[in-house]
């Protein structure tokens, strides 16, 4: 053996080669051990994780089943309450029986889901059932819901009315949370109208209220919708404005000192021969455009002796750059635009309810231009209506104003001028006949209540009023119009009427 060993030739390169091979084998051996360890660990983790997630999935599934069972129990209780409510339903609530045609299904299922969400939200706010209390462990988990069901009749009543309101006003909401918030806004307004209408005829109240397309607005949305009227600098007024009496004297209609005592007791331009049905500005703050275009439409028809024709409010929104589009404006600047450009037909430049990036008036035929802008003082309104016709005015629109449904408005007004409308007439009526106007569609029961409430008063007292055309569609107010209280001379400035009055001169 020693002889064999002695015969081996141990060169330096050979020794180095053996060392390298040995090192390589050791490294590979360690790698193999690590790989095996990692593989075993991964397999173990995978197995453990699979077992865990499988068990967790089972737990979640069981929780989901429990939650679904709980929700079904709660909705079953709600359905019982709803059925009891249906037994005492009146004509106003018949909508509960009708199908609510939208993607979410029929009215009853939608109503139940909304009531369930509402009830759950209320339960979270005032939780009288402590589930962590040992003494409550064996109590039915629907206890807290049944505890609050006694008060659900009112919610069912208001919710059924809200669903009817949604359908009538084509309301669609993003999700149930928004729908519940809109419901709360609606309920506040609905209760306000009911309380107001109970008092109609008392304390001088001569108008009734009703929920409408704005009744689901929040207070912030109300404030954003009504923008302060843009002011007009004196240099523009002096350049373009012609005072009413000067205009009438120039056209030989009257002498400059003509007095209002010569005028009739009433003047009404609401006839179909003067106007198309009132239009709807939608959620765009473009009342100034509708007032100005409405004024121009009357002037165009009256001057040319034609039937009513619709002109473009959208052109004013897009092209009258002195105004702020859907963020407010002033009819004066719309008339100023008409002086320099002309007006498009409504069919050629239709209303969109929002401001476009570009003015597209090159696409339409520009018809008659305005040459000057007339100005009316507060004590000249009756004179203006008799000699030149309708005029644009500004009012201080308030929540009372928005909820107006019929009668002669004498409610609270906003001290700030924030809404442009068209003054189309004036009149007077005995107090007992305040709701007998042919344009009024007030419920006969409210008229009866009004007459009962004014008993003992001097029902022969005369109520004087303005007739105003709004831009909230024909379903608002009295066919799209509102009658606003005034004094006999028409110069009291109630609700801002008379503070900012213009008309176009053709």
Curated annotation (Swiss-Prot):
PROSITE patterns this protein is in?
THIOL_PROTEASE_ASN, THIOL_PROTEASE_CYS, THIOL_PROTEASE_HIS
Localization per record:
Membrane
Instruction: Please classify the protein's predominant subcellular localization into one broad category.
Output: membrane
Q: Which residues lie on this side of the membrane: Cytoplasmic?
A: 1-32
Please provide one cellular component term from the Gene Ontology annotations of this protein.
membrane
- The entry's propeptide annotation covers 1-262
Task: Check the record and name the CDD domains matching this protein.
Answer: Peptidase_C1A (cd02248)
The biological process GO terms on file are: proteolysis
UniProt-listed InterPro entries? Papain-like_cys_pep_sf, Pept_asp_AS, Pept_cys_AS, Pept_his_AS, Peptidase_C1A, Peptidase_C1A_C, Peptidase_C1A_papain-like, Prot_inhib_I29
Q: What is its EC number?
A: 3.4.22.-
Which Pfam families would you find in this protein's record? Inhibitor_I29, Peptidase_C1
Q: Which residues lie on this side of the membrane: Lumenal?
A: 54-506
PANTHER family named among the record's database cross-references: CYSTEINE PROTEASE FAMILY C1-RELATED (PTHR12411)
Give a short account of what the protein does. Cysteine protease.
What name has this protein been given in UniProt?
Vinckepain-1
Give the species. Answer: Plasmodium vinckei
């Amino acid at each position: 053996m020693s002889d064999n060993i002695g015969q081996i030739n141990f060169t330096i390169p050979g020794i180095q080669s053996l060392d390298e091979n040995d090192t390589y084998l050791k490294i590979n051996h360690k790698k193999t051990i690590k790989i095996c360890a990692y593989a075993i660990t991964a397999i173990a983790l995978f197995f453990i994780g699979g077992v865990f997630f499988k068990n967790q999935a089972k737990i979640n599934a069981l929780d989901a089943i429990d939650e679904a069972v709980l929700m079904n129990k709660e909705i079953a209780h709600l359905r019982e309450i709803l059925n009891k409510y249906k037994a005492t339903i009146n004509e106003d609530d018949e909508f509960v029986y009708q199908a609510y045609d939208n993607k979410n299904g029929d009215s009853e299922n939608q109503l139940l889901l909304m009531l369930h969400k509402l009830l759950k939200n209320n339960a979270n706010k005032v939780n009288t059932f402590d589930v962590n209390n040992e003494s409550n462990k064996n109590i039915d988990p629907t206890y807290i819901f049944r505890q609050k069901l006694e008060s659900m009749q009112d919610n069912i009543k208001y919710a059924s009315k809200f669903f009817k309101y949604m359908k009538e006003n084509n309301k669609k909401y993003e999700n149930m949370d928004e729908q519940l918030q809109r419901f709360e806004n609606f309920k506040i307004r609905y209760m306000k109208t009911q309380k107001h209408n109970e008092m109609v005829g008392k304390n001088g109240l001569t108008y009734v209220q009703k929920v409408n397309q704005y009744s689901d607005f929040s207070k912030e949305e109300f404030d954003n919708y009504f923008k302060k009227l843009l002011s007009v600098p004196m240099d523009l007024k002096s350049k373009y404005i012609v005072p009413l009496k000067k205009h009438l004297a120039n056209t030989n209609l009257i002498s400059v000192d003509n007095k209002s005592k010569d005028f009739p007791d009433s003047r009404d331009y609401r006839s179909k021969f003067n106007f198309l049905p009132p239009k709807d500005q939608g959620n765009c703050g473009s009342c100034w455009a509708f007032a100005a275009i409405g004024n121009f439409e009357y002037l165009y028809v009256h001057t040319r002796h034609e039937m009513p024709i619709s002109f473009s409010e959208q052109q004013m929104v897009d092209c009258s750059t002195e105004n702020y589009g859907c963020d407010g404006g002033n009819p004066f600047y719309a008339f100023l635009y008409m002086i320099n450009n002309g007006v498009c037909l409504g069919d050629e430049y239709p209303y969109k309810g929002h401001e476009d990036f570009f003015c597209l008036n090159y696409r339409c035929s520009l018809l008659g231009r305005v040459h000057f802008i007339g100005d009316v003082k507060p004590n000249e309104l009756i004179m203006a209506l008799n000699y030149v016709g309708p005029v644009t005015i500004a009012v201080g629109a308030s929540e009372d104003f928005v909820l107006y449904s019929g009668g002669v408005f004498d409610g609270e007004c906003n001290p700030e001028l924030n809404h442009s409308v068209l003054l189309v007439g004036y009149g007077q009526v005995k107090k007992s006949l305040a709701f007998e106007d042919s344009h009024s569609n007030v419920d006969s029961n409210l008229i009866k209540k009004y007459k009962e409430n004014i008993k003992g008063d001097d029902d022969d007292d005369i109520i004087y009023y303005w007739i105003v055309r709004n831009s909230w569609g024909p379903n608002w107010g009295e066919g799209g119009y509102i009658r606003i209280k005034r004094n006999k001379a028409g110069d009291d400035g109630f609700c801002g009427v008379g503070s900012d009055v213009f008309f176009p001169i053709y």
